Amino acid sequence: MGSAITGWGSALPDKVLTNADFEAHLDTTDQWIVERTGIRERHIGGSTRGLAIEAGHAALARAGLAGADIELVVVATTTPDQTLPAASATVHEALGCRGGAFDLNAACAGFTYSLVLADSMITAGVRRALVIGSDTLSRSTDFEDRATAILFGDGAGAVVLEAGARDDLVLAYDLGADGTAAPLLYAEIGGFIEMDGREIFRRAVRAEVDSIGKVFAAAGCTADDIALFVPHQANVRIIEAVNERIGLPMERTVVVIDRIGNTSAGSIPYGLADAANAGRLDEGDLVLLSGFGAGMTWASVVIRWGRRGVA
């Protein structure tokens, strides 16, 4: 028996920063930002915990479950509200879950790491898991720095995994890291995000294309078999470059960066929930998730969408 995604949800803060807001105090324009990033607006505010709880509630409701039905909570985040306790513990309590809870920090690739790990724990005996990606990068953003201020937003996404599916959820995955790239994107404790955007772009495209090639080979599929691609929403030009290299049309790709910016671990589950709510996913579809982040870390996974026998 495998697992299946039976619920999904997302959350964004109410406050919206548009590109026009940056035009007022930075040497930039809406056209410049859109051409280089694809971003038109981003949401900021709230807490990592609060957004995670909201997204988790939505995912549970979609799955028709209560918090007490959940035996494992995994929260992917690089921006916990406090050093101790883990965000997952407070989310676990707020939602009334049972079993274990832990945080996972793999930066923007964190949700994909967490999904793979939760699926393996279901194989080992967990019946139901709640996997959340939640980040509030605005708290680490210098809004006087044009290079980073325009990029980041706050947000969360969540999925419920349940055991009992006839087929495996995860067909193949690839996880990777390269610590030599750590100086290219980092934030000291209490400091702002520092990044070398040009080099990050180059390495991200290369790492993601290589990772996707590995999961295609392991899953025995090609880009033609993928019904939908949900990439990390860092920069639309990165998404376009990856798609061109793997031979996947943008029409089969989720792009939400224009309205949420880069929400780190929240971006892939947010995009997945957005696609599911829009009716872009059908039973049995092969879905590609892929992302990269500080570390550098990267992760790709091919999953099969649908309940397929889950009661």
Which sequence ranges carry the predicted segments?
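A structural motif shared across PLP-dependent enzymes of the aminotransferase-like
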Residues: D21-A24, T28, S47-G50, T79-A89, ...
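Claisen-condensing/thiolase-fold acyl-transfer catalytic domains that form or cleave C-C bonds
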Residues: R49, I53-G56, L60, T79-P80, ...
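Phosphate/pyrophosphate-binding loops at sites that engage ATP/ADP/AMP, CoA/4′-phosphopantetheine
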Residues: A55-E71, D210-A227, A275-R280
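Short glycine-aspartate micro-motif
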Residues: G2-I5, L72-V74, A101, R127-V131, ...
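Buried hydrophobic positions in well-ordered alpha/beta secondary-structure cores of metabolic enzymes
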Residues: I5-G7, I33, A59, V73, ...
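Condensing-enzyme catalytic core mediating Claisen C-C bond formation in acyl metabolism
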Residues: M1-G46, D145-R206, D210-G213, F292, ...
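Flexible, glycine-rich active-site loops centered on histidine and acidic residues
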Residues: D119, T123, R127-G155
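Anion-binding (especially nucleotide phosphate/pyrophosphate-binding) glycine-rich loop
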Residues: R62, A66-R98
